[in-house]
Design a protein with these regions (language model features):
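Start-transfer (signal-anchor) and selected internal transmembrane alpha helices
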Residues: 1-17, 259-268
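Soluble catalytic regions of membrane-associated enzymes that act on cell-envelope
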Residues: 277-450, 458, 474-495
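Internal/C-terminal transmembrane anchor helices
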Residues: 257-281
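Short hydrophobic alpha-helices at membrane interfaces in multi-pass membrane enzymes
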Residues: 102-105, 141-157, 185-194
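Membrane-interface coil-to-helix junctions
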Residues: 18-75
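Membrane-interface micro-motifs in multi-pass membrane enzymes
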Residues: 31-35, 49-53, 73, 77, ...
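Transmembrane-helix motifs of polytopic, lipid-linked glycan transferases
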Residues: 78-95, 134-138
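Membrane-embedded alpha-helical segments of integral membrane proteins
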Residues: 186-253
């Protein structure tokens, strides 16, 4: 009966974790998958296995590549964490069969759950932790000290080579276990951490690994350019604390009856409180919306981006996604002011050299038709990815090199993607464009983007963001996105002088055969008292009538200036007039 109750508990934990992660972390797993590029080739896998911690790296890469599939990321993570909890509980039971400290068994698992939400954490750390637990469970099954010590020695060496820094945690755990169990000649086990320390020192000495923290600490399972938050150490601390407490309480009088029930309930309550507080502190809910928009961009679900942007926001990243979605739908200049706007940075955020912003800017530049800038940002995002590249940015590099006719480079990236699980079919479909200008030029996407290529080279934004856009539009008049971005840029900056020049120069041409809604509203501002000027640019009667009502209400409420913005927003918050006057 006890056996089945334990299985039932683990099933309940798995189901709970899966449902929870499915609801609150679905888009996080999609982003984690984008942070690595795992190739299913012998050369790639052997290269990883030759590194300290290589097997954990390969196993985690194999698992994470499936995170692109709906629900799979939540399922794999829930299954792995539940398995770790069950394994550690079995270890504690092996140390003290009468142990009722289920709290201690699940604290390391909760700590590992919290660190999963860190975008810069590598899943390898969780896999390596599981490998360490498995080794500990097997070694503790050996009753005699000397055989157990020999097995521990081999396990330490194997863990160092296959799992990385967890080998030191394993070695220290065995020393602690032997000491607290008062094993005769327990101090022989001190050789275990000594050997790990010597191996680690040699790795640093001969530049196999760059820093000691990557040899002995869980920092190795984090993006190497950053210093991890303290939460990454919690699982190690909780694990060792649980081991110490269980060893010290071994052979103590076991609680029974109501005391045992009360102990179990109190432990579950404590675990629940820790879970709730940990999710609040480390759940990364502030960045979750950004991860969601990144996924919608990747899958071209522009309407879902716009739905998520209906609520007012001051976050320039959200606005950048929003305006890109409008541009992709061809309605940026018509509907930009139906959504929240806060200046020109909502069109193009500043580059901070991070992989996330680089990927976003690559998408924005590609939307504008700026192939050179899109390629540069894709390259920056790709080389800055956590593990060997970013699949989507590698796809972008395939596209941009095909557009440029740099077929050998494109072929190299295609070959990489052909070695992956999810992207191989897409990559194979791109081979028809290699060394085939006609196929590229007749393709709706690649051909149109090739027509955006400028005849002369220019440094990006050397003459200004708007100048680059106008050059692109002049090069390819069918590229409406670039021209609309330029016009909306002037409107968001309230640069009416340049906007006037833009309209008067290009109205009636292929670039601007008619004015979009926001441009018509802005033309009225250019010459508020000259209706003939409006007619010159084809401002519709409905917009003229709406402006008349707008002006009348502004004049009626001018004596109540504090309340006027709120009053006008109700009826005219979707107009450029409101933005120009009140923002």
């Amino acid at each position: 009966m006890k056996k089945y109750s334990g299985v039932a508990l683990h099933v309940i934990v798995f189901v709970f974790l899966f449902i929870f992660l499915r609801i609150f972390s679905e888009y996080h797993f999609y982003c984690v998958e984008q942070n690595q590029l795992f190739q299913l080739t012998p050369f790639f896998i052997i290269d990883k296995l030759m590194q300290p911690g290589g097997l954990a790296m390969v196993l985690s890469g194999c698992l994470v590549q499936f995170f692109i599939l709906p629900n799979v990321g939540a399922m794999i993570t829930a299954a792995l964490l539940t398995s770790l909890g069950a394994l550690f509980w079995a270890i504690l039971k092996r140390i003290d069969p009468r142990s009722h400290g289920i709290l201690w068994a699940w604290l390391p698992v909760l700590s590992l759950l919290f660190v999963q939400w860190d975008f810069n954490y590598r899943f390898q750390g969780t896999v390596a932790f599981g490998m360490m637990l498995l080794a500990l469970y097997l070694v503790l099954g050996i009753r005699n000290f000397i055989p157990r010590l020999i097995a521990s020695l081999f396990a330490s060496l194997l863990l160092f080579g296959l799992a990385g820094p967890v080998s030191l945690l394993f070695a220290l755990s065995m020393v602690g276990y032997e000491a607290m169990s008062r094993t005769p000649r327990w101090y022989y086990s001190a050789i275990l951490p000594m050997i790990v320390l010597i191996l680690g020192g040699l790795c640093v000495r001969y530049s196999v690994i760059g820093e000691y923290r990557f040899v002995f600490l869980p920092d190795s399972y984090y993006y190497f350019r950053l210093v991890p938050d303290k939460v990454i150490y919690f699982s190690w601390i909780a694990f060792y604390a649980a081991l110490v407490v269980t060893c010290l309480c071994k052979n103590k009088e076991s609680w029974a009856g109501k005391k045992r029930l009360a102990l179990g309930i109190s432990q579950f309550i404590i675990l629940g409180l820790i879970f709730w507080k940990g999710f609040d502190l480390y759940g990364e809910q502030k960045s979750y919306r950004l991860k969601m928009m990144d996924y919608f961009t990747r899958t071209e679900q522009w309407d879902r981006i716009l739905v998520s942007c209906k609520e007012p926001t001051t976050n320039q990243l959200y606005l950048c996604y929003q305006n890109m979605a409008l541009a992709r739908k061809g309605i940026l200049a018509d509907e930009a002011f139906k959504y929240t706007q806060h200046g020109p940075r909502g069109l193009m955020v500043a580059w901070n050299k991070s992989t996330t912003i680089s990927a976003l800017l690559s998408d924005v530049y590609f939307t504008m038709g700026n192939v050179a800038a899109a390629q540069e940002m894709a390259f920056e995002s790709n080389i800055g990815a956590l593990c060997d590249g970013n699949p989507r940015m590698t796809q972008r590099l395939v596209q941009t090199n095909l557009i440029y006719g740099a077929y050998p480079v494109a072929e190299k990236y295609i070959a990489v993607l052909e070695n992956t699980f999810y992207y191989k079919d897409w990559a194979k479909a791109q081979r028809k464009f290699l060394y085939n200008d006609e196929a590229v030029e007749t393709d709706p996407l690649l051909g149109n983007m090739r027509r955006n290529l400028l005849a002369e080279n220019h440094l990006i934004q050397m003459d200004g963001f708007d100048t680059d856009l106008i050059r692109l539009a002049e090069q390819n008049p069918s590229n409406k996105a670039a021209f609309h971005y330029a016009g909306v840029f002037y409107l968001l900056a309230k640069d009416m002088t340049r906007f006037k020049t833009l309209v008067e120069t290009y109205y009636g041409t292929d670039l601007l055969p008619s004015l979009p809604v926001s441009f018509q509203e802005a033309v009225i501002i250019l010459s508020e008292k000259d209706p003939d000027y409006w007619k010159r640019f084809g401002v519709s009667e409905s917009i003229v009538g709406r402006f008349t009502d707008y002006k009348r209400q502004v004049l009626a409420g001018r004596n109540n200036s504090n309340a006027l913005p709120g009053l006008m927003y109700r009826s005219y918050g979707d107009t450029y007039w409101y933005y120009y006057m009140f923002k």
